[in-house]
Amino acid sequence: MDTFITKNFQTTIIQKAKNTMAEFSEDPELQPAVLFNICVHLEVCYVISDMNFLDEEGKTYTALEGQGKEQNLRPQYEVIEGMPRNIAWMVQRSLAQEHGIETPRYLADLFDYKTKRFIEVGITKGLADDYFWKKKEKLGNSMELMIFSYNQDYSLSDESSLDEEGKGRVLSRLTELQAELSLKNLWQVLIGEEEIEKGIDFKLGQTISKLRNISVPAGFSNFEGMRSYIDNIDPKGAIERNLARMSPLVSVTPKKLKWEDLRPIGPHIYNHELPEVPYNAFLLMSDELGLANMTEGKSKKPKTLAKECLERYSTLRDQTDPILIMKSEKANENFLWRLWRDCVNTISNEETGNELQKTNYAKWATGDGLTYQKIMKEVAIDDETMYQEEPKIPNKCRVAAWVQAEMNLLSTLTSKRALDLPEIGPDVAPVEHVGSERRKYFVNEINYCKASTVMMKYVLFHTSLLNESNASMGKYKVIPITNRVVNEKGESFDMLYGLAVKGQSHLRGDTDVVTVVTFEFSSTDPRVDSGKWPKYTVFKIGSLFVSGREKPVYLYCRVNGTNKIQMKWGMEARRCLLQSMQQMEAIVDQESSIQGYDMTKACFKGDRVNNPKTFSIGTQEGKLVKGSFGKALRVIFTKCLMHYVFGNAQLEGFSAESRRLLLLIQALKDRKGPWVFDLEGMYFGVEECISNNPWVIQSAYWFNEWLGIEKEGSKVLESIDEIMDE
């Protein structure tokens, strides 16, 4: 029965039916016949509503008669069935009050705007007349009745309420369902709607009425007063309730979508008067510089690891006369430098732990004592100087070249690997051999990808940060930013990318913020792309000789903050691997099913029959750039990492809203002729998410490029079609 229901009814109808059952604590899996009855009942209500319309003067039209006049028509019937029970009652009372009629004692299924009458719809396995009189006895004249039977008969209290076509459609659908059920031997197990209705009607006496009035919560004098308050309150269901009331006034005109109707999103990202989007990731990525120290591969305490790395690069460790290269707007460079020196001294001193003294500059950097003071509501009301702070709307920014550069650098191969994955036991079943082979190819490609090194740095740092935040809530702690890499020869190196300072971390809630000051090494001169670094204060602290060449070393300092949720996600950053690998594995599986054998090796390297697979991985000078299967895997993995690193509400909103546009473009490509309404509203929903998130702005830029290419392609196809027609 479950499969039958899924196959024969729309998903929205099934979901509403399940919600209705949930309100009565009924289980759809245990009572599939009840679920079926509710689905049929809902569908009949929608069929009746979809077939009948009214114009502004109240004249009735069928769906066929109303073609071409859709702008001036509205549904004749309001569908109440399928709404959550409390909202349905609110809508029913509102409609009764609006049209000056008495509210029925029972919930109706439909409301007729022409006759201003509520309607009960019934479906029965027996005779329609028998069920009609059962309903009539229960409901009296409080509402009209529309009863339909699987036996191809019907009974209406008002014959003019439904035309012949409407009756025919309902009865045809019931016949079709009965035939399908009989074919699958399910007809006999189905119980009729009339058999599951159980109820006892009784008159509300004076005693019970008094008890009801006494039982209302404090603040209400009687039951009717409480009901009136509930009807007018603005709870979470306010949107649904108001929409239900507005439905007769709403006119939606679908329009067939053409390529010309689609425009680029976020035009402000090309506005050169706006500032470039700044770098705001928690840690440096492609600009990082790790101080390497060869190790035997044994595990070490973070402090020991950092101390050994600093000892190897003593000129950087002992630097006391830095050169200020760049200063962020609110930074105090003297305080930041003194805090850095305290961090170095703490790490270098074997006798102390990694706790910092609470100096005035440490308090400034960690924001100690700058938290908002909570004021009780009663006090705030009496104080005229107290007011609600205006919400801060993010400033709009334009696209910056550094985002694409980060993407390119992170998806390249390096000579070191940092990926730390658990070992898997030996294969047992044949399918495990395929899995191991596939995993080997995937991991080899990802292992030496720059993005995997950055990912592991995030994982290790957030793990240490969360541990310290929980273990030392009232202390300032130095946390080394470290990683361990292995080169192609199998030699292990400890890497120190910088140091961080954790402020006080009494994190009661998941969103409570802990201040983190980061000090990171880099060989990138910030003046080369100054628009990227407005959030950083940068010092030049010396130089290193790499391959016989002197490279300057800069210290990037930033006051930042995070919370438990973000730290937990940082610890789980390895999930980025899953999404990218699953995406590529789906392609391998598809190829394997076509060829009839495992195509893992063929996709990566090719075989005697097939060349290695290639994919479009970007554009260059307006043309698509192809890349190998492995390169495509690394690009998708890097995108997953960037999605995590720059993830916020803007990105969530953009991903959800832009998906609709992508589906429309795909439908146009497939020549399915999509219809839309309120396209500008969809664009508004997308564009309000494009503010100052680097990944969102870059994604919008890529979307516009892709849209341009698809539009050009559609013109070529149209010209080919014209030639073929001639």
From Swiss-Prot:
GO MF terms held by the record: endonuclease activity; metal ion binding; RNA binding
Cofactor note: Binds 2 manganese ions per subunit.
Primary localization: host cell
Gene that specifies this protein: PA
Chain location of the short sequence motif Nuclear localization signal 1 (NLS1) per the record: 125-140
Documented EC number(s): 3.1.-.-
UniProt source species: Influenza B virus (strain B/Lee/1940)
Domain of life (superkingdom): Viruses
The protein's required cofactors: Mn(2+)
Post-translational modification summary for this protein: Phosphorylated on serines and threonines by host kinases, including human casein kinase II.
Assembly and interaction partners: Influenza RNA polymerase is composed of three subunits: PB1, PB2 and PA. Interacts (via C-terminus) with PB1 (via N-terminus).
Residues the record lists as binding Mn(2+) 1: 41, 109, 120-121
Record carries keyword Magnesium: no
Residues the entry annotates as binding Mn(2+) 2: 81, 109
Family listed: Belongs to the influenza viruses PA family.
HAMAP family named among the record's database cross-references: INFV_PA (MF_04063)
Main EC class the enzyme belongs to: hydrolase
Keywords assigned: Cap snatching, Endonuclease, Eukaryotic host gene expression shutoff by virus, Eukaryotic host transcription shutoff by virus, Host cytoplasm, Host gene expression shutoff by virus, Host nucleus, Host-virus interaction, Hydrolase, Inhibition of host RNA polymerase II by virus, Manganese, Metal-binding, Nuclease, Phosphoprotein
Pfam families associated with the record: Flu_PA (PF00603)
GO cellular component, one term: host cell nucleus
Protein's cellular compartments: Host cytoplasm; Host nucleus
Free-text function comment from the UniProt entry: Plays an essential role in viral RNA transcription and replication by forming the heterotrimeric polymerase complex together with PB1 and PB2 subunits. The complex transcribes viral mRNAs by using a unique mechanism called cap-snatching. It consists in the hijacking and cleavage of host capped pre-mRNAs. These short capped RNAs are then used as primers for viral mRNAs. The PB2 subunit is responsible for the binding of the 5' cap of cellular pre-mRNAs which are subsequently cleaved after 10-13 nucleotides by the PA subunit that carries the endonuclease activity.
Protein name as catalogued: Polymerase acidic protein
GO biological process: cap snatching; DNA-templated transcription; symbiont-mediated suppression of host gene expression; symbiont-mediated suppression of host mRNA transcription via inhibition of RNA polymerase II activity; viral RNA genome replication; viral translational frameshifting
UniProt motif Nuclear localization signal 2 (NLS2): location: 183-244
